[in-house]
Amino acid sequence: MSTNFIYPNAHLIAGVDEVGRGPLVGAVVTAAVILDPNNPIEGLADSKKLSEKKRLLLAEEIKAKALCWSLGRAEPEEIDRLNILHATMLAMQRAVAGLNIQPDFVLVDGNRIPTLPMPAQAVIKGDSLVAEISAASILAKVARDQEMAELDVQYPEYGFAKHKGYPTKLHFEKLEQFGATPFHRKSFAPVKKILGL
């Protein structure tokens, strides 16, 4: 972790991050993590910079060593109703509310923070600067990838395990060929177009 981030003066700090704002399908998944300072975890980094194997190993270690962790999500219908930004904020609120220890302070990756009952701060590139946010990004990514693998079993023709629901050339081709699944985000332009909305 970089040392140029100054931590707030707080005892129990939760890190929060999201995965899945860009995909055309599935939930946006968030995680909140309070790490144990007496039980450090080596190798925490932004989940996008880690191999899948390393992410899976770290996710297990985070779950075992963290003081507490929680996942929060917003479903495709909530994304369609609220818009992706508001749905992401809602999913973050759910992740923090799901912690079985209430944090004194919350650090959120990015430039926006949800409304929370405790002080919070947004940290640009937080997934590379703050261990708690890195841990949250890993848990959220592993959880969402798992959901895409399960969706791939249900709808093998779409290639969800490959593109994870992101708007790739392959995904567009499959959408054109097979139409949208019930899990596609109807408010996202490419899906809207396919559905003729």
From Swiss-Prot:
Its EC number is 3.1.26.4. GO terms for molecular function: manganese ion binding; RNA binding; RNA-DNA hybrid ribonuclease activity. Manganese or magnesium. Binds 1 divalent metal ion per monomer in the absence of substrate. May bind a second metal ion after substrate binding. Residues 11-197 form the RNase H type-2 domain. GO terms for biological process: DNA replication, removal of RNA primer; mismatch repair. Gene3D superfamilies: Ribonuclease H-like superfamily/Ribonuclease H. Belongs to the RNase HII family. This is Ribonuclease HII.
